[in-house]
């Protein structure tokens, strides 16, 4: 509610409402929708190691229960489960499921997902240092950690990618590599919050 009030319609607000409990994730999603969120970011159920059929059911139940777009979040290093390309293809049939923040680092799966899913199912990089590579495979940009500290640079990188200027995007991506690594020198979000604190 505080974020929605502060933004005051100037930008879309996407609320993170994921949980390893379908019931809890649905309740959080409905609360966020009531608070005015424009969309929802839903991580895969962590710890439980759901099957692909279980993931489909989990996300479909939540998508059925709200009237705002959902972005799925695949981050197997944190959750212990990966969303398969075929699972994305099934979930993409739901009108409220619009894309994925892909932080799995599996470029073969990303290619297969792009081939199996309709064009309006968006893929965003979930790893700053993979932004250009994912955009080359049909991604739409990045849901970024680094942009909290270097917004102009990450905006420029995304613009170059969306213009298909991958020569310039690749150079900028390489220039940002050390900074991207520094933002993960400890468990996220400790480094980025420390950097923001240093910036005042």
Question: What are the residue ranges of the model-derived segments?
Answer:
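GST superfamily/GST-like fold recognition
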Residues: 197-198
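Active-site beta->alpha loop and helix N-cap motifs at the rims of alpha/beta catalytic domains
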Residues: 1-80
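Catalytic alpha/beta core domains of metabolic enzymes, predominantly
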Residues: 64-65, 78-184
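Interdomain hinge/lid region at the active-site interface
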Residues: 188
């Amino acid at each position: 509610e505080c974020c929605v009030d502060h933004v005051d319609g100037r930008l879309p607000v996407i609320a993170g409402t994921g949980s390893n409990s379908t019931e809890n994730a649905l309740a959080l999603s409905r609360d966020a929708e009531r608070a005015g969120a424009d969309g929802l970011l839903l991580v895969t159920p962590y710890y439980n190691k759901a099957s692909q059929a279980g993931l489909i059911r989990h996300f479909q139940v939540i998508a059925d229960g709200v009237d705002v777009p959902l972005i799925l979040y695949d981050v197997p290093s944190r959750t212990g489960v990966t969303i398969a390309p075929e699972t994305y293809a099934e979930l993409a049939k739901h009108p409220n499921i619009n894309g994925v923040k892909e932080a799995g680092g599996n470029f073969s799966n990303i290619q297969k997902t792009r081939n199996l899913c309709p064009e309006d199912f968006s893929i965003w990089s979930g790893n700053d240092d993979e932004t250009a590579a994912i955009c080359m495979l049909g991604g739409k940009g990045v849901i970024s950690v680094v942009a909290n500290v270097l917004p102009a640079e990450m905006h420029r990188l995304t613009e170059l990618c969306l213009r298909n200027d991958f020569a310039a995007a690749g150079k900028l991506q390489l220039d940002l590599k050390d900074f991207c690594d520094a933002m993960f020198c400890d468990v996220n979000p400790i480094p980025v919050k420390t950097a923001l604190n240093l910036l005042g």
